[in-house]
Amino acid sequence: MARYTGATCKLCRREGMKLFLKGDRCYTDKCAFVRRSYAPGQHGASRKKLSNYGTQLREKQKAKRIYGVLEGQFRNTYERAEKMRGIAGENLLKLLEMRLDNVVYRLGYGASRTEARQLVNHGHFLVNGKKVDIASFKVSVNDVITVCEKSRGSERFKMFAENPKALPKWLEANVENFEGKVIAEPAREDIDVPVNETLIVELYSK
């Protein structure tokens, strides 16, 4: 599967804000955005005023980068969101939140979505008792996500278990059993990403 292989910190600088793509490092002075908060490139320090289209495009790019999704997948996800009941923009964010890699990240198994995606791809998780190694797999309400038995002894997973993170309302976890459960669909107020989804809808509606 295609994926972005460039410098992660440049993505935050391009969007003009921290996207927290590197987990704990983003909270330290080592974060590249702290040292250089302007866009990369020769003329990055002098930001031009964006047109309406440019603003909408930047918002889409920001959402793609936060969730680690490339254009084709993002477009397909939007088209699914558009066909669902409700508000297309909110549906889009809900679908992105319900990706397995994001759920693993929200459960605390990964300092970043990138790390969570790698853990999924390497086959460390079961969904309802069956191994799933596809990061884009869409989980559903009442699905149970479990760390594989053979992975639980690793220092990485022990560390995650010893330092549980606060969960969104739509998830619950049993840390001792290395298990999490989707108990509801995420509401918009439960999704803490700095994205104005209305601008994305406007962009795709043209």
Curated annotation (Swiss-Prot):
Pfam family, any one: S4
Alphabetic keyword roster: Ribonucleoprotein, Ribosomal protein, RNA-binding, rRNA-binding
Gene designation per UniProt: rpsD1
GO cellular component: small ribosomal subunit
Gene3D superfamilies to which the protein is assigned, alphabetical: Ribosomal Protein S4 Delta 41, Chain A, domain 1, RNA-binding S4 domain
InterPro entries for this protein: Ribosomal_uS4, Ribosomal_uS4_bac-type, Ribosomal_uS4_CS, Ribosomal_uS4_N, S4_RNA-bd, S4_RNA-bd_sf
Domain of life per record: Bacteria
Residues of the S4 RNA-binding domain: 98-163
Molecular functions (GO terms): rRNA binding; structural constituent of ribosome
Keyword Acyltransferase tagged: no
Organism: Clostridium perfringens (strain SM101 / Type A)
SUPFAM superfamilies on file: Alpha-L RNA-binding motif
Family note: Belongs to the universal ribosomal protein uS4 family.
Name this protein carries in UniProt: Small ribosomal subunit protein uS4A
PROSITE patterns: RIBOSOMAL_S4 (PS00632), S4 (PS50889)
